Amino acid sequence: MEVREISLAATTPLATDYINGTFPIEKGFSYSLQAEDVFWRRLDDIKGRAYPRRELVEYLRSYHQRFHASSETFYNIEKLLHPESVVVVGGQQAGLLTGPLYTIYKIISVIKLAKEQERKLGVPVVPLFWIAGEDHDIAEVNHVYIAEDGKIKKYVYPDIPQEKRMVSDVPLDHQVCSTWITNIVKTYGETETTNKLLDFLFQCLDQSKTFVDFFASIVLRLFASEGLVVLNAADVPLRAIESSFFTALIECHREVTDAVLRKQHQLRQLGYKNTLDIQPHCANLFYYDGRQRWLLEHDPQKEVFHSKKGEFVFSKDELIQLAKTKPGHLSNNVVTRPLMQEFLLPTLAFVAGPGEIAYWAELKEAFSIFGFKMPPVIPRVNITIVERSIQTDLAEIGIDIMDVFKGRLEEAKQQWLAQQTRYPLEEMFAKAKAEIEEIHRPLREFGMEIDRGLAGLLTKNATLLQAQIDFLHQTLQRALIRKYEVELRKFSRVEMSLMPNQAPQERIWNIFYYINKYGFDFLEKLLQLDYKWNGMHKIVYI
């Protein structure tokens, strides 16, 4: 594998400016990416903090035993008992088969940064992945994209409940899921890895009752030798550890909301669009009734917390009592999840995607309410994999990969096609249509002088003539495409691989396509690459 770095804008302007060093750091973050001592400073800032280390380790031991996690993972869990140990954390929803590639890249980023900083700082650093099991947006995680008959298809897991159930509580039907997996892997083609891959996935499925179980089982096996630790944010035993901070979030709900709204206003004044949809009445917590999450709002007149349509109503004391006795009924939203993470974990760094970078900037003042400093926010690695066959296609059609990323592939294809004939078709047909119109116009005028009632017929006749020219143009264009079908297919293959659906590769394709084709050591090779935390896009040639 070879790596080439290129500069590409992030998907949000704020993330682009943050990565490039042009965002005013103090306006949205506590640490600068450009500071060489950023991790030493962070280590110093959190060394006096108290964390629920023993409770967390007991929970993590129990959770990982369910998945028969590796000895390396249990070794890393025990590290958390060390008073100076810290974590590098990143998180994502529990996509089926791990979802798009960027989830895998985020895990790789967490692992690589943890190893690097353990070596540099001389303290234990644990790679931890926060699974957003409390999320209820099933449509985000219930599918995988596949390539079939030259087209991109969204292949959806069919057995989904209708309620807004937390992903961690969405059950998997093993028979339905086995068929779903088999059909996906079939589209990858038969290789010497295929049977091993199916066995791997079915073993993970056997350990799993829910979407989150399946995700956790897969990533713990894929990264077993790296000692990855995972945390299911929706797990009831974890909620017991979070109980006291839920109480703090209830007590300070208004201050949190006001802090976010103020920060959003400041960022708008700097020219950045807000990412979070938050209103003054938001309580930033959900109530979970066991089947559905209900976002809570606060009514200052009645001094109650309630779901939008009043299905559930709580006084402040009732909600605090719930946090103390039944914390499993409470769930964080996008604002309070990072705060809960900071309460739980001695976080050296948070590995983030571009969207997360943008919305975390809106949370800086919310962190300070609880005496926290936002951890260093480190952009995850962005990767595009270029297979050897795609590299060959690019060379043969004479296209630079930047043309693909800049959305110029279709334009390049049309230019290439135009160069294959000595006749400039577009110009010829445009000229023909103009000349026919010039000839026909005086005929229409003459007809109108004879009988103005012929206006409709004369116009229709002109339209038919132009339509015939268009028909001939399209016929010749199709013939040209047929003649160069082999060459044009190369453009399609390049687009399908590198920018499917005009989206970055890492947002569409799944890691198991590549594992099926190149073997399980494909992931090990990705892990062995030297990644620089500079925000540059990595093109990996294989």
Swiss-Prot record:
Disulfide bonds: none annotated. Residues 458-479 form a coiled coil. HAMAP family: BshC (MF_01867). One of its GO terms (molecular function) is ligase activity. Its EC number is 6.-.-.-. The keyword Ligase applies. Involved in bacillithiol (BSH) biosynthesis. May catalyze the last step of the pathway, the addition of cysteine to glucosamine malate (GlcN-Mal) to generate BSH. It comes from Geobacillus sp. (strain WCH70). Pfam families: CC_BshC, Rossmann-like_BshC. Belongs to the BshC family. This is Putative cysteine ligase BshC. Keywords: Coiled coil, Ligase.
